[in-house]
């Protein structure tokens, strides 16, 4: 299953705040505003199309119209092919809002074709790039995109290292417990580590860091596993819906995986 390019109608149905051209009445008259649709049009000129959108809060007309939202872009011409045949698409994630509370921010991500799962890259080379609305220009955007693309060899090198590292059973358990700690925080939760480490698909079976990382990342972010909460109640973990939390969780998991690379 691949991601398809979203039309304006698709975007409006899933995250109408993305297409909002106005600004919140709470901002001052001096506030300089760059609507997200302008950024989308500029990204399309550079060959990057929208494949996913999300927004904070309700999607009803007028509700949260100016709140934070996330747009995921992909360029079909930019793709990473591994030696074992796996296809990974680099992505660019844009977060923005029309309430005057934040600049728009770009991050790098990866999309695994094998499981339609998205990862957020969290390295010194791929730190989030924030741009103020005031003074925005197409040339600045072009420079940001080119900068991210130029760093792709670093991503390929990192993914190759992930594939070369073989984890012991103890290390896999350690990784899973650390990931659960990131998901549930100090409150903790009783979870079957075996369930977290059990691959969803045959392609992810193995002891390579890359495979273990993807298995755990998918479970921790998408949920679906049983756990006992600190209250003693049995629950089923839900998928992370808040995209800000999802990005944060992904970044922390990526950093955790990197800690296993010598």
Predicted features along the sequence, with ranges:
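Intrinsically disordered, low-complexity regulatory segments
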Residues: 1-34, 41, 45, 57, ...
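Intrinsically disordered, low-complexity regions enriched in serine/threonine
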Residues: 2-3, 77-262
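Functionally constrained cores in energy, signaling, and assembly domains
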Residues: 7-8, 12-13, 22-24, 42, ...
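A broad "ordered helical/assembly scaffold" signature
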Residues: 26-27, 53, 144
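Short amphipathic alpha-helical segments
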Residues: 31-39, 137-140, 144
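Amphipathic, interaction-prone secondary-structure segments
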Residues: 33-104, 246
């Amino acid at each position: 299953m691949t991601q398809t390019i979203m039309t304006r109608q698709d975007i409006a149905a899933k995250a109408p705040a993305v297409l909002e051209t106005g600004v919140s009445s709470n901002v001052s008259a001096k506030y300089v505003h760059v609507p997200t649709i302008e950024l989308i049009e500029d990204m399309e000129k550079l060959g990057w199309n929208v494949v996913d959108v999300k927004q904070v809060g309700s999607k009803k007309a007028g509700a949260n119209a100016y709140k934070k939202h996330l747009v995921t872009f992909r360029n079909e011409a930019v793709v990473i092919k591994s030696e074992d045949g796996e296809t990974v698409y680099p992505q660019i994630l844009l977060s923005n809002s029309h309430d005057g509370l934040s600049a728009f921010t770009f991050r790098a991500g990866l999309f695994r074709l094998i499981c339609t799962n998205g990862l957020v890259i969290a390295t010194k080379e791929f730190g989030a790039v924030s741009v103020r609305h005031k003074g925005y220009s197409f040339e600045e955007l072009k420079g940001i995109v080119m900068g991210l693309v130029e760093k792709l060899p670093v991503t390929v090198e990192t993914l190759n290292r992930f594939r070369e590292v073989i984890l012991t059973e103890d290390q896999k358990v350690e990784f899973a417990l650390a990931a659960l700690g990131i998901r549930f925080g100090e409150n903790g939760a009783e979870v079957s580590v075996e369930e977290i480490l059990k691959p969803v698909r045959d392609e992810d079976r193995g002891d390579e860091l890359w495979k273990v990382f993807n298995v755990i990342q998918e479970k921790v972010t998408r949920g679906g596993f049983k756990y006992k909460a600190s209250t003693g109640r049995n629950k089923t973990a839900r998928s992370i819906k808040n995209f800000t939390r999802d990005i944060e969780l992904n970044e922390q998991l990526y950093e955790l995986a990197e800690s296993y690379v010598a």
